[in-house]
Amino acid sequence: MFKFKASDLPEILTRWSARYSVFVPSGSPDNAQMRIWSRRTRKEVRFMEPDEYTNLIVAPKGFVFGEREELFRWEGNEKTCTAISAPSSSSLQEEDKILFGLRPCDTYGLAYMDRFFLGEHHDINYHLRRQHVFIVAVNCLEAGPECYCASMGTGPFAEITAHTEYGMQAGKGYDLLLTPDYGPDHKKGEKGENDWYWVEAGSDRGKALLSHVAPLLYRDLEFTGRRRKKALQEDALKTFRRTLDTSTVRQVLAAHFKGEEWDAIASSCIACTGCTRVC
């Protein structure tokens, strides 16, 4: 298994930025947002280390899903309606981009969107954006106060399951997966001499990303990496303050499917799509 020194992470991001648009978490612990990283902006962007934030304040859905966009046009009258243009991706000009620092819960969500929008209900615009997005996820060593991903099987570590269209072995949705392994002298937000990242490729695209930074990688025994990762995951599971019993979720939701609370929520809807944008 490969690993690299935490102190080399800025250089890795910079090397990637020579080929891709690289987005990294920036801001404050309670307001982490994606900002672009490059040799030019490196000193302007306050890059947040993975132990400085729990998750982004807004999900990264906007990188693959347009807030508003034209799907088709039609013409007609009271009796007939005829489509005069089909969905087209010709108007979307996308460039390859890397989203660094996504958490396992969001990568699982991305994999679910892949399964839907790239499956039977194929969405051309989603497809175009998705094929240009590379995901570098980072496992969580500590749960946030409101986190319950362990109960849902979507964290704190991403696991390898089924394949998606882009070769990702994902119920996870990542191309690369990093696991922080901090030394005993580690200080939050800093890079100590004994701080490392274990790195695993989840797709051929992920392997290509690694090839661009090969001189900065160290190879360790697969057994050593797996054993260390398992220990870190067990420690992370102990940090959860919330749990959720999912055994009866289906029955509870079905029983309240026509509940009055949904009517109350619907009455305030102004069709801004904000809820689906951030979820």
Protein language model features and the residues they cover:
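Cysteine-centered iron-sulfur cluster-binding motifs in ferredoxin-type domains/subunits
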Residues: 262-278
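Long, contiguous internal "core" modules enriched in hydrophobic/ aromatic residues
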Residues: 253-263
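Iron-sulfur-associated redox domains of electron-transfer enzymes in respiratory
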Residues: 1-252
